[in-house]
Design a protein with these regions (language model features):
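Beta-strand-rich domains and repeat architectures in extracellular enzymes and scaffolds
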Residues: 55-87, 102-114, 150-151, 262-267
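Surface loop/turn motifs at the tips and blade-to-blade linkers of beta-strand repeat domains
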Residues: 57-62, 101-106, 141-147, 182-189, ...
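Signature of short aromatic-glycine-proline-rich micro-motifs recurring in repeat-based ectodomains
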Residues: 66, 194-196, 241-251
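Conserved beta-strand positions in repeat-built beta-propeller and related beta-rich domains
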Residues: 77-83, 120-127, 161-165, 206-210, ...
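Short loop/turn segments that connect beta-strands within beta-propeller blades
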Residues: 92-96, 134-138, 173-176, 218-222, ...
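Blade-loop segments of beta-propeller domains
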Residues: 95-133, 137-149
């Protein structure tokens, strides 16, 4: 059993980072592992904390700068980033083999992806442009949004989008118009750097960029209801392997399986959550 440790973030360091005026404008596309030592993952949180147990480890393309990940119909769908390397892929789970791929032209920098109303949606980082595909990867439309694009998921009927701040926005899945927006908080404090998103059992799972943590968010209140500590996963790789940060959450609803990976990670992990700390 591999279970991650408790939060080790210092409250004093946390306050410094939370108050930085440039904290929301850090360049997501130039992330480097360990570049941010503090995070919105709060040591003072009174919410439950979950570690993990690795169920399976699957091959993953080590050249993929993973920005979005979903599971559907027995396959993984992955969005990758970097200028000139951004793509949307269909991937075989057991082998990691890329079965289908469509590349994004420059200057687009690929970001989060989701499947909603039988359409694949892919965001871009700073181009304020999203792409719509059918299941055969034919582009069938585009849409615009006024912010940066980071993560996106679907609650079954609406899109939910992050832009690296503490704000989540709900979009009409047909018109792509913003329906509502909501700040994400823990103990009244904003949780910034919301990145890759996944809708899991009525909660929004949000990877906190630059950290090993995933926030479990209530879509009703915007409050964090729990934290997932995935520290230790990246240590599964030899130090000579040039990996980047944790990024990529996919949920298999039919079989209740949770998958996670990271940018340039050579493995994708199926994990089971293990409660570490209960609500005080």
């Amino acid at each position: 059993m591999i279970v991650a440790g408790f939060f080790l973030v210092c409250l004093g360091v946390l306050s410094f980072w939370m108050d930085r005026p440039d904290c929301r404008s850090l360049p997501e596309q130039t992330s480097v592992s360990g570049a941010i030592s503090a995070s919105p993952v709060v040591a003072f949180s009174k919410n439950s904390v979950y570690g993990y147990r690795i169920i399976h480890a699957y091959p993953h393309d080590p050249t993929a700068f993973t920005q979005g990940l979903i599971y559907d119909g027995g396959y993984l769908y992955e969005g990758t980033g970097l200028h000139g390397q951004s793509s949307l892929r269909k991937v075989e789970l057991k082998t990691g083999k890329v079965l289908q791929i469509v590349s994004l032209p420059d200057p687009y920098f690929g970001e989060g992806i989701t499947l909603c109303r039988n359409r694949l949606i892919q965001l871009t980082y700073q181009s304020q442009r999203g792409f719509i595909y059918d299941r055969d990867f034919r582009q069938i439309g585009q849409f615009a949004y006024p912010t940066e694009g980071w993560g996106i998921t679907c609650d079954g009927s609406r899109l939910i989008m992050s832009d690296g701040t503490a704000i989540l926005r709900w979009l009409d899945a047909r018109t792509f118009k913003v329906i509502k927006q909501m700040p994400v908080t823990d103990q009244g404090r904003p949780v910034i750097h919301l990145n890759e998103l996944e809708y899991v059992k009525g909660e929004i799972f949000a990877n906190i960029w630059g950290t090993d943590y995933i926030a479990r968010i209530s879509p009703v209140s915007g409050k964090v209801v729990g934290w997932i500590d995935l520290s230790g996963l990246s240590k599964q790789f030899d130090k000579s392997v040039p990996i980047d940060v944790l990024n990529g959450i996919a949920y298999d609803q039919q079989h209740d399986r949770l998958f996670v990976t990271g940018k340039f990670w050579p493995k994708l992990f199926e994990i089971r959550l293990v409660r570490q700390r209960s609500v005080e």
